[in-house]
């Protein structure tokens, strides 16, 4: 693509930005990136359809993102999700049917890579890597983006999934449901981090426990595993209950601290009920 073409694509995204400025951001967007009716490569669309049929809680959107990367970037600018969950089937050399969840580390792109990505995107080529590259290029990639990827067993024209693809679909749905359920907790932890750094609050049993808990929640966001989270929650709760809190706390601190405990209780109960 020429520099002029790249400029036009950027101008189109900028125009969408102008239209979206007054729109309220959404907390979570589940995006299915798929190649329509291409056997297992259609998995992302099927995940989105299943979630839509089940019904989604307030603030959670699920959409098919099977169109060009520039259009997807424009849609991200409109919705401005705080958390994006991209679901796809993509060949990575893993055993067929394998499903992997990972927290995206945004790529660093040079001008040539951006230009090549936009050139592919305007042709309608669809691939999760391309969606990420274009979103990064136009600076609309959400702060937290999670990838749920299945390894396809069968690719090429065809309706429906292979047996391995069907198993992968169920695994992907389970992982996405977990991500949706954990999103409010992780957003709350993200809000709390800057409030407990530095010396605004005096050290206390509860504050030290909270800092450890937030580190563990960051690990949960990165790796998808609870680790010591609930043991640290109990230590934190005990510190608050025994009034081992910090000098300098205000009403917002108290509200957020107790909200974190309650949110952890909610998520623990929900995941125990749906193992």
Regions found by a protein language model. Give the residues of each.
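N-terminal catalytic or cofactor-binding beta/alpha core of small enzyme domains
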Residues: 2-152, 159-171, 177-187
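Soluble extracellular-acting proteins and domains
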Residues: 185-274
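A broad detector of the eukaryotic-type serine/threonine protein kinase catalytic domain
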Residues: 153-155, 241
């Amino acid at each position: 693509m020429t520099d002029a073409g790249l400029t036009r694509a950027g101008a189109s995204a900028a125009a969408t930005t102008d239209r979206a400025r007054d729109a309220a951001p959404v907390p979570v967007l589940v995006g299915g990136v798929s190649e329509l009716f291409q056997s297992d490569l259609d998995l992302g669309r099927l995940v989105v359809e299943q979630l839509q049929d089940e019904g989604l809680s307030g603030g959670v959107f699920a959409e098919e993102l099977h169109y060009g990367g520039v259009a997807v970037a424009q849609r991200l600018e409109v919705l401005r999700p705080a958390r994006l969950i991209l679901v796809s089937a993509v060949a990575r050399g893993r055993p067929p049917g394998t499903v992997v969840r990972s927290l995206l580390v945004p790529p660093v792109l040079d001008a040539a890579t951006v230009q090549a990505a936009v050139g592919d995107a305007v042709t309608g080529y669809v691939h999760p890597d391309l969606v990420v590259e274009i979103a990064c290029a136009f600076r609309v990639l959400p702060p937290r983006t999670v990838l749920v990827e299945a390894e396809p067993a069968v690719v090429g024209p065809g309706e429906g999934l292979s047996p391995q693809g069907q198993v992968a679909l169920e695994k992907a749905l389970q992982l996405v449901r977990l991500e949706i359920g954990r999103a409010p907790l992780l957003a709350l932890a993200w809000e709390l981090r800057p409030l407990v750094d530095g010396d605004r609050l005096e050290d206390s049993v509860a504050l030290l426990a909270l800092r450890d808990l937030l580190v563990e929640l960051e690990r949960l966001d990165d790796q998808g595993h609870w680790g010591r989270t609930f043991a640290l929650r109990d230590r934190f709760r005990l510190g608050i209950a025994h009034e081992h809190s910090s000098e300098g706390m205000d009403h917002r601190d108290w509200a957020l601290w107790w909200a974190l405990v309650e949110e952890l209780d909610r998520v623990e109960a929900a995941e125990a009920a749906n193992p």
